[in-house]
UniProtKB/Swiss-Prot annotation:
PANTHER family: GULONOLACTONE OXIDASE, L-GULONOLACTONE OXIDASE 5. One of its GO terms (molecular function) is L-gulonolactone oxidase activity. SUPFAM superfamilies: FAD-binding/transporter-associated domain-like (SSF56176). Catalyzes the oxidation of L-gulono-1,4-lactone to ascorbic acid. L-gulono-1,4-lactone is oxidized to hydrogen peroxide and L-xylo-hexulonolactone which spontaneously isomerizes to L-ascorbate. This is L-gulonolactone oxidase 5.
Length: 590
């Protein structure tokens, strides 16, 4: 039976989808926890690794002959020594593997994955010195909880607590702030213990103890290491006395947002924005530190990080696939408005007492307000529910383009995006289906591969097709924004996110890159912890872009020929609409 796609039919399904979105955002159930990202054919041999989305940007399969699961630093030393002696390639994997690029991949099929899954212990908590030493496989959630036990707090961190200490150090993970030392987790680290390849005299493995006072050059290299210096075994954090935060969200139009973005971060310590460009709105996060004895027991359990019913996830994904197939821009905009208004009206998951939301401001202790991820907490329920992006169910599947624009250029960049919207106001509704454009403040860091200056980090998430050769609705608009950021404003891509093209020539953007590479050569002269991917992004050998038919559709290249898009489906390589130097895959009706 064939069904006509009438306006009333469209309206019905948009309404139904809106109800599904509402149910998904506010429903919390027991959730099947994510599976181990490493899977082996037999025991710990003949293994593959993937990321939390179930697919790397180029959709390749990363293999290794074995995986090792050390439980102590001594075991880690033994594992690294044996692999070094044998000349085997090694890469580190984590419990949840949330980095999108191929940072966990080793070369060929004969390498070794070293998982930090069981290096997840607290080594020492010193309330008097206000320090906490943990193993590198400790998750952010554990770190926050262990600090709170002794009355201490990590001041800034990512909003998702499923990342590990080693993963945060490897990719430069951060929260949002221009205050203090800034929002990067690695800038609150005082000591790093790392196991690197060693010489025969070292027994083929060497424990290195790094700090700002004793080994400043090596310490600044290790703070954002991409995993190429060795395996971090332990990290010591400098913490602060526990404090509370007072948070409220305010939605405004974006008419003066260009100017507000430059100054808002100076007014509020934990400020950020969610920009809804197609709706012409911005959600301002007014978030400040208050005394620990201030009344309030608030909790932030962010709705999109809660578990979701798999049936609801499948329906929502199917609806967006239909919108893509039918080029239903209006439908996407209606759904986006439903999602954003629902999130705002339900305070994004904030409650004043851990149960209900009664009004702003929400005041709570730092450990209850800074990060969340309750979809990780559940017991096995046979995938009746899961984290929204769990690849074992039909859920969200997306690209994530994330980059830092210097604060001095943010106004101009926002104006460029607004200029694109003037051409077609519906062009960015697809971003608002995925929360909108999250904007976080970052500052310059002494880490050699850390941020270079005060900046705003733009986090853009959008639909990814199951078929890599299927183009997206308004693909050209998002590609142009990506190229405006990277090429016009020389933006720095987030090491743990992004598509391949973002890393083309990236190492030239870091003034301390030569110093980093010098430490790398000293620590691992044979490149045992390096891979084809890390060599490409560090400018050592090769290029991260992949030029082939359809390569621009998945961000593997910037198109220079129609074949790099989808000419059979009407998508051709054309100049940008605002930034003429851009080359984007544009739908050209026949």
């Amino acid at each position: 039976m064939a069904f006509g796609y009438s306006p009333s039919y469209c309206s019905f399904w948009r309404t139904l989808l809106g109800l599904y979105c509402l149910f998904t955002l506010v429903h919390t159930v027991i959730s099947t926890p994510p599976e181990d990202p490493v899977k082996c054919v037999s025991g710990n041999t003949n293994c593959i690794v993937t990321n939390s989305l179930g697919a790397f940007p180029d959709r390749s399969t990363c293999r290794a002959a074995n995986v090792a699961y050390p439980t102590t630093e001594a075991e880690l030393v033994s594992i690294v020594a044996a692999a070094t002696k044998a000349g085997r390639k090694m890469r580190v994997t984590t419990r949840y593997s949330h980095s999108i690029p191929k940072l966990t991949c080793t070369d060929g099929n004969d390498g070794l994955f070293i998982s930090t899954k069981f290096l997840n212990h607290t080594v020492q908590a010193d309330a008097k010195a206000m320090t906490l030493t943990v193993e590198s496989g400790v998750t952010l959630r554990q770190l926050i909880a262990e600090a709170a036990k002794v009355g201490l707090a990590l001041p800034y961190a990512p909003y998702w607590w499923g990342v590990t200490v080693g993963g945060m150090m490897g990719t430069g993970a951060h929260g949002s702030s221009l205050w203090g030392k800034g929002s990067a987790v690695h800038d609150y680290v005082t000591e790093i213990r790392m196991v690197s390849p060693g010489s025969v005299n070292d027994g083929f493995a060497k424990i290195r103890v790094l700090s700002e006072t004793t080994t400043p050059n090596e310490f600044n290299a290790a703070k954002v290491s991409l995993g190429v210096l060795g395996v971090i075994s332990q990290v010591t954090f400098e913490l602060q006395p526990m404090f509370k935060r007072s948070l409220k969200y305010v939605m405004r139009n974006d008419l003066d947002f260009n100017d507000e973005a430059l100054t808002f971060g100076k007014k509020h310590e934990f400020a950020d924005f969610v920009w809804l460009p197609s709706q012409g709105k911005v959600v301002y996060r007014m978030d400040d530190r208050v005394a620990v004895n201030t009344l309030g027991n608030g909790l932030y359990d962010f709705f999109p990080f809660r578990s979701q019913l798999s049936a609801v996830l499948a329906t929502t994904r199917s609806s967006e696939e239909t919108q893509e197939t039918l080029r239903d821009a209006h439908g996407k905009c209606v759904t986006a408005t439903t999602i954003s208004s629902t999130l705002f009206s339900t305070s994004y998951g904030l409650t004043n007492n851990g149960i209900t939301f009664t009004g702003y401001p929400v005041i709570g202790s730092q450990n209850r307000m800074m990060s969340s991820g309750s979809c990780l907490d559940g017991l096995e329920d046979k995938l009746t529910s899961a984290c929204a992006w769990d690849s074992r169910v039909k859920g969200v599947f997306y690209h994530q383009t994330t980059f830092s624009i210097p604060l001095t250029q943010v106004k101009s960049f926002i104006n460029d995006i607004k200029s694109l919207l003037k051409i077609d106001s519906k062009s960015l509704c697809g971003l608002e289906l995925y929360y909108g454009i999250l904007m976080r403040y970052v500052t310059s860091s002494p880490a050699y591969l850390g941020k270079e200056t005060e900046a705003i980090d733009f986090d853009i998430t959008y639909y990814r097709a199951n078929d890599p050769l299927t183009p997206r609705l308004y693909e050209d608009f998002i590609e142009e924004i990506e190229q405006i950021a990277l090429l016009k404003y020389n933006a720095l891509p987030h090491w743990g996110k992004n598509r391949n093209l973002a890393f083309d020539g990236v190492i030239k953007k870091y003034k301390n890159a030569p110093a980093f590479l010098k430490v790398k050569e000293s620590y691992d002269p044979n490149g045992l912890f390096s891979s084809e991917w890390t060599d490409q992004i560090l400018g050592i050998k090769g290029n991260p872009t992949i030029v082939k038919d359809g390569c621009a559709l998945e961000g593997l290249c910037i198109c220079s020929d129609d074949a790099h898009c989808a000419p059979s489906k009407g998508y051709l390589c054309r100049p940008g609409k605002v930034y003429k130097e851009a080359r984007v895959c544009t739908h050209v009706p026949k």
